[in-house]
Amino acid sequence: MNERQILALLKTGQVVFHYPLKVHFREGGGDFGFSVPKRNFKRAVRRNLLKRRVREAYRLNAGRLNGRSYDIFIYYIGKEVEDYERIDKSVAQVLDDLAAR
């Protein structure tokens, strides 16, 4: 996703919260993006760890959308580093919510 697509998604998309994630989405092309804010995690090592965990959780759970395509932007809102199981559970819940719509 490029900056223009992200801004359009933030303006026109819907939002779902499942701690520690805030997910903006809309039906569309099937693009995926995510962000871990620098203001919450100063060290790049921590941000990269969380980005790897979110990316892997999405990759493993993407099949829950049942072939429907959404533009999805995941924003990590937690203040602490959560373990992979917590992130995976949150991503699975979000994708189940989207599939049910």
Model-derived features: positions:
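Positively charged, solvent-exposed patches that mediate nucleic-acid binding
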Residues: 1-101
